[in-house]
């Protein structure tokens, strides 16, 4: 272990273009996509054959065959097979949490370099069998004779044969993230117009980033895809206003397919290291990984908003680092739903919430919206759950590197009432 905490740097990142579910990546697995993202990272930073200190990644939707996903990715990638690896899981915060864990190991001197990432596919989601059928099959497998197995299998009924397709619902409530957010939108009085404006800006900013070539050193093509499949460069506020609600009340709902992220597929990876490790290899670190915080809310008994945990994580992070909400040059807030972003921002402006829930004397205040997701967000790029963290880290590190100085805030909401936040500096 190091005698003192060492600075940790984001050297850079790579991802494959995110695609809508059942699109170009319909037959690609988590392992396929994450390996492609890691190989792109290896090509960009000359890591082929390099033994990295550690590798951590994860996926929200995993098959049983992917129990050792990260290690299998390493073994199939251009990294040295001697690179150790393990899986991380925190729903939509997985990619960022993987980076936090790796940054911690670098900071205390356990390793000098690491790769963190995430992958998710809703096109190749695991399909389960009926629970009763599963138990019968397990009972049959335990039998010592053919007759015993047949007796167990004769218990199977036609209704047990139908597969169980995974659904995007919280196990404790039976509601989807969208349905939970629709409740939050009503509670915080988030208007349809405000949500559509956020979605519009997300697409405009990402389209401009592609047009300027800004994404070129952050993305590697995969299976014929060179840009994010969800991006609508020609969208307008008028087009968005015509869409019907998909969550909440059919007549008064405000959440549409455009101001909510679609199911999607993709993968990302980021390279973290000490400054010396990077310089020795001729690499220029982009931003320092300063600190991070995770939080959770009780959305079951206390009925808090499912995706409102970042509203708690961020002020704790600010307090520990002696910062205010306004002390940032960039804000990278994950746009699972426009309503969730706007509700979080509104909570930080709300005196009652900040006093009663956060224990503050006054509101955190507002952010400069011109600094929010300036190169596009999840509403435009899409949100392959575990891959979002890597996209955001790489984006923010590049923004800070280009500016030459400054500070950026990351905020990601996650299923299960969780949230993760982090600070990067240059």
Each model region followed by its residue ranges:
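Condensing-enzyme catalytic core mediating Claisen C-C bond formation in acyl metabolism
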Residues: 1-28, 152-167, 241-312, 320-321, ...
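Active-site-proximal alpha-helical scaffold in enzymes
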Residues: 89-120, 128, 185-214, 269-277, ...
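N-terminal extracellular/periplasmic Venus flytrap/periplasmic-binding protein-like
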Residues: 14-16, 26-36, 44, 157, ...
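Short, well-ordered amphipathic alpha-helical segments that serve as non-catalytic structural scaffolds
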Residues: 30-45, 69-73, 98, 177-184, ...
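Conserved catalytic cysteine-centered active-site region
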Residues: 59-114, 157-160, 172-176, 234-262, ...
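Conserved beta-ketoacyl condensing-enzyme motif
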Residues: 26-114, 119-144, 213, 219-229, ...
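Active-site pocket-lining segment
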Residues: 297-380
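Flexible glycine-/small-residue-enriched beta->alpha junction loops
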Residues: 113-183
């Amino acid at each position: 272990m190091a005698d003192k905490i060492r600075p940790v740097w984001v050297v850079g990142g790579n991802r494959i273009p995110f695609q809508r579910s059942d699109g170009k990546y319909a037959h690609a697995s988590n392992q396929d996509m994450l390996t492609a993202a890691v190989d792109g990272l290896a090509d960009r930073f000359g890591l082929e054959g390099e033994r990295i200190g550690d590798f951590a990644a994860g996926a929200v939707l995993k098959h049983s065959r992917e129990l050792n996903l990260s290690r299998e990715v390493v073994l199939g990638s251009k990294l040295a097979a001697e690179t150790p690896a393990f899986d991380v899981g925190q729903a939509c915060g997985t990619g960022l949490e993987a980076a936090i864990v790796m940054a911690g190991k670098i900071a205390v001197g356990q390793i000098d370099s690491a790769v963190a990432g995430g992958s998710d596919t809703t096109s190749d989601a695991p399909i389960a069998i009926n629970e009763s059928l599963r138990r019968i099959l397990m009972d049959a497998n335990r039998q010592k004779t053919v007759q015993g197995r047949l007796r167990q299998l004769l218990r199977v009924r036609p209704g047990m044969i139908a597969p169980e397709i995974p659904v995007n619902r919280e196990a404790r409530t039976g509601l989807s993230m969208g349905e939970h957010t629709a409740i939050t939108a009503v509670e915080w009085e988030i208007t349809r117009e405000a949500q559509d404006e956020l979605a519009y800006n997300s697409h405009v900013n990402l389209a401009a980033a592609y047009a300027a070539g800004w994404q070129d050193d952050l993305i590697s093509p995969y299976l014929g895809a060179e840009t994010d499949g969800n991006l609508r460069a020609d969208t307008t506020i008028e087009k968005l206003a015509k869409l019907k609600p998909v969550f909440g009340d059919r007549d008064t709902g405000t959440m549409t397919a455009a101001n909510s992220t679609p199911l999607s597929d993709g993968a990302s990876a980021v390279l973290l290291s000490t400054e010396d490790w990077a310089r020795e290899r001729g690499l220029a670190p982009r931003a320092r990984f300063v600190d991070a915080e995770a939080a959770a809310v009780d959305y079951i008994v206390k009925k808090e908003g499912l995706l409102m945990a970042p509203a708690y994580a961020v002020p704790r992070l600010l307090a520990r680092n002696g910062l205010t909400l306004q002390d940032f040059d960039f804000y990278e807030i994950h746009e699972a739903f426009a309503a969730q972003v706007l509700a979080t921002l509104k909570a930080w402006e709300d005196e009652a919430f900040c006093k009663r829930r956060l224990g503050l004397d006054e509101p955190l205040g507002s952010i400069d919206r011109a600094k929010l997701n300036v190169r596009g967000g999840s509403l435009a790029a899409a949100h392959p759950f575990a891959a979002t963290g890597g996209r955001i880290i790489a984006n923010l590190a590049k923004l800070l590197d280009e500016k030459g100085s400054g500070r950026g805030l990351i905020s990601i909401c996650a299923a299960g009432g969780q949230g993760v936040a982090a600070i990067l500096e240059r």
